[in-house]
Amino acid sequence: TIELLKQLQQYKEIIETHLIVTKGAEMTLEQETDYTLEQLYAHADEVHDNYNIGAGPASGSYRTMGMIVIPCSMKTLVGIVSGYSDNLVLRAADITLKERRKKISLPENGLSRYGNLSNNRCLCWQEYIMIIWKRNS
């Protein structure tokens, strides 16, 4: 995730990155990397609270180029596929699908069981995606 944010910073003139971090992602960052949450935040143009369901990315009128979910946990994948939007990540993904914007989901390692593959197929069928990037005006 941090590497992707660093790469996207090269295109600051045309891409503004917005970051939403789930509790699970916070735990993964802490347990599996040497990065702090503050270091992750430093690479995004704007950070949104995952529990603020009224934030800009939750609205179809909030114009974005698309969304990337990385890494995408099974819980998040199922939420996106089923349309269950109880947090900002899921709501933003739902809006991204509804508005037919570009979307990318990069599942975590180990999501290769049959049920997980079925959810990935559903997501591909829906033309799915999440970081959110917003077009600069």
Tell where the protein language model's regions lie, with residue ranges.
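A cross-family phosphate/adenosyl-ligand binding-site feature
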Residues: T1-I104, E108-S137
